[in-house]
Amino acid sequence: MLDSRAARFPDRRFARFEDGTQWTYASCRDEVRRLAQGLQARRVRKGDRVFVWLPSGRPIVLAWFAINYLGAVYVPLNTAYKGKVLEHVINAAGGSVMLAHPSLTERLQGLQTPKLQQVFTDVDALLGDASALDDSTPIEHWDIQCIIYTSGTTGPSKGVLSPYLQGYTTAVVNYGYLQDGECILINLPMFHVGGTSSITCALVRSGSFYLVEGFSTTQFWNQVREGQCSTTSGLIGVMAAFLSKAEPRADDADNPLKYITMFPVNEETIAFAKRFGFDYLTGFNMTEVSTPLMTDMNAPPDGSCGWPRSGIECRLVDENDIEIPRGQIGELICRSDIPWNMNAGYDGLPEATARAWRNGWFHTGDLFRQDEQGKYYFVDRIKDTIRRRGENISSFEVENAIRQFPQVDEVVVVGVANEVAEQDVLAVIKPKAGDPFDPAKLIEFLSPLLAYFMIPRYVRLVNEIPKTETNKPRKVVFRDEGITADTWDREKAGIRLRRERL
């Protein structure tokens, strides 16, 4: 595809980087071919795994494209990796070549990584002679393009095998609104599917991208205007909330943004979209699949992830894979009518792959419900569901309510065993600096927001909530620790909640 775009639009701008470097389609193709030849001269061949451990910028995109130009497999590493996590990923993928930032290589010292043989810290020093490149090896859409590592909350990171067709499909689904020649601002990392699919979409649409090192509330709008970006790689989680805190200005809507994919969409994010004058949509995605659920543009804030996109079939099932009636809660499973546009399994983990793909459907591990119109609503991760006195409780919903309490900075909610073999709700809270935190006031605040059985019995205050390498809270830590000596007990404090009698 890069060759095609370089032939059709050689002088069209394709890339802009934060350091001021730019590529046209032709200059990008020329550099990619030179690096591909340099890697080929160092015995990188089709199917080889090549680690790329670099921050966002020209070198990582150049490395990614050159690796794939040879048909080799791009294996990006999170720049936060260190210690045993880093050792596990390197050994699991089994690559022998790494392109790394020089400041990161000291983390390799002391690790047992016997298969890793060559580590290069200067991408430009590897540029070779493009005329000597052997590019005769065909690349098929079912070949593995990359291995993206996803952090689990209960076990080691798993490498998701992503074929070329999955990368293409994810790009055109997530950013299908991008028009020919438009620019996309990318502030997600290149070890994240949101980052790679954004660049792929720019290539598919003959557009351009502006890659910055990360999301910045203070620089976001300057970057949008500098790059004349009509969209971004997405506003995920609290990004929109952070941007909304800026003082309103008369020219807020005077910006080039036209449309954004946001996760989630609610009243606050819609107000944000209206304030800054862009259209929005949302959906559901994970590294393993190619955005199976999408809403219409400017859908109402009903909490829905939309409907299955064209070419995707979805079901909600029980623990035996039996489809459940609408309105009930079940696991989302999905499959495609075209092979290879979802993951090809977990690298080196045949049992995990078989579990995820059992009965010919990919099991997301997420609980959803479906309304009478066929729209899907996210409820919780299966392992994050709490069972209390016959009721299934969504930790996601309880966390959202607790976040509204003014003194809460971060929160995770887990189930802990109780005396009757089910669970009680534990809220682990990192409070904001300031006044002392009173758990009783939190319970009073939550009473009108949540069903009585959803309100936490236990509240524990912590200084930090541990995260995975991809910044997800490690809930398993608090499940394993259970009720600690510093945990506040609502019932011991004399606060008992009862079901309202009608």
Short names for language-model regions:
Residues Y81, M98, C314, C334-I338, ...:
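AMP-binding/adenylate-forming catalytic core of the ANL superfamily
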Residues Q37, A41-R42, F65, Y69-G128, ...:
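Structural core segment of the AMP-binding/adenylate-forming
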Residues Y168-C183, F191-T231, K245:
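Conserved AMP-binding/adenylation subdomain of ANL enzymes
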Residues D11-G57, V61-F65, K82-E87, L165:
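Conserved AMP-binding/adenylate-forming core of the ANL superfamily
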Residues P10-D11, S131-Y149, P156, Y177-C183:
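Conserved pre-ATP/AMP-binding loop-to-beta segment of ANL
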Residues V204, E226-L235, S244-D302, E313, ...:
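Gly/Ser/Thr-rich phosphate-binding loop
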Residues T24-A26, Q145-T169:
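Conserved AMP-binding A3 loop
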